[in-house]
Amino acid sequence: MHGYRAHDLLWLAAMPAGEALPAWASAAWLQQAPLVVRRATTAPGCLPVGLRGPARSQRHACEIGVDQVLHRVTPEMLSARVAAMPPDAMQYAALAALRTMVPLLDATGWAWGPTGGAGFALASGLPVLRADSDLDLVLRLDAPPDAAQTEVLRTIAAAVTNCRLDLQIDTGHGGFAYAEWAAGRSKILLKTDQGPLLTATPWELV
């Protein structure tokens, strides 16, 4: 995907060409609102993206040309912005939880960052969060965690108590929900660029 990864946020130089967009996806909105890279296969030179509108129900999947990308912000870049959040951001449980999580996440040495609504709000400043919004995080682990690292993951998962935490593990081959893996299921759902699959070995795909 030309170095782009799922959850990257993109701003475009112009409206997506050749796409029938919903009415809410206006030029004015897309000047402010980034597109999120999703997992899918595309033609060479294209990227699969999702558009997000002001309302929870406003979502739209499409493709764009790589040459349309003007600016990119990754989840890892957003992790460095958490400390600079204004005080009024703490009214949202997801952002309040995120701020308290930073020392714990940074101490792991793993690449990490906020995604979902929290990441979108941090990157754009747009008011898309609600009082009951989840906190979505991605952790990059390119190998199965050892016993000590597994305990660290448990600590991270237990640290958020004021909102729902959706912790995704990115293996480099795809992403899966930490909660599924921690539950000890024989197979978990791994989201890949070729589509979702059930696997017992999410770190060993070829």
Name the predicted role of every residue range.
Residues 195-206:
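Extended, charge-rich low-complexity interaction segments
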Residues 158-195:
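Conserved catalytic core of two-metal-ion nucleotidyltransferases
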Residues 129, 153-157, 184:
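Short, solvent-exposed amphipathic alpha-helical segments in soluble enzyme
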Residues 1-117, 150-163, 167:
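Helical scaffold of the NTase/Pol beta-like nucleotidyltransferase catalytic core
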Residues 101-135, 139-145:
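Active-site nucleotide-donor binding segment shared across nucleotidyl transfer reactions
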Residues 120-124, 131, 183, 190-192, ...:
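Generic structural "secondary-structure junction" signal
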